[in-house]
């Protein structure tokens, strides 16, 4: 744990995630990139928004690994129920580009919340810019199961 010059412990710097406040049909909270990609898939983006999305999605793809290409079952609900990616606080170069995605969501009336946590869950994947965690209290016995209907 880091300490300040006075010898007391510094508060932990939190991980950051941007996600919908509402569960999707699989019981998960869709992240910021998925929310914008859903708008694109539904044909809702303007030409400028689509250009932004494609350009920045390519930039993110080049800037950091997709955890599922490194650990194929990282998002498998049977293995890691509710797994979600969080930015590390040191990933400032990645966080700087999120604002444009948030603007697109705001324009389209799509809710997206910023979450910060020093301990978002059990880490199942980690690299230099992100962690994927299973949220506390979400394991194979407590995994969300959508109601049939």
Label every model-predicted segment.
Residues 1-85:
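Long, contiguous N-terminal structural blocks used for assembly/anchoring
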Residues 87-111:
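Extracellular-facing segments of soluble proteins and assemblies that are Gly/Ser/Thr-biased and enriched
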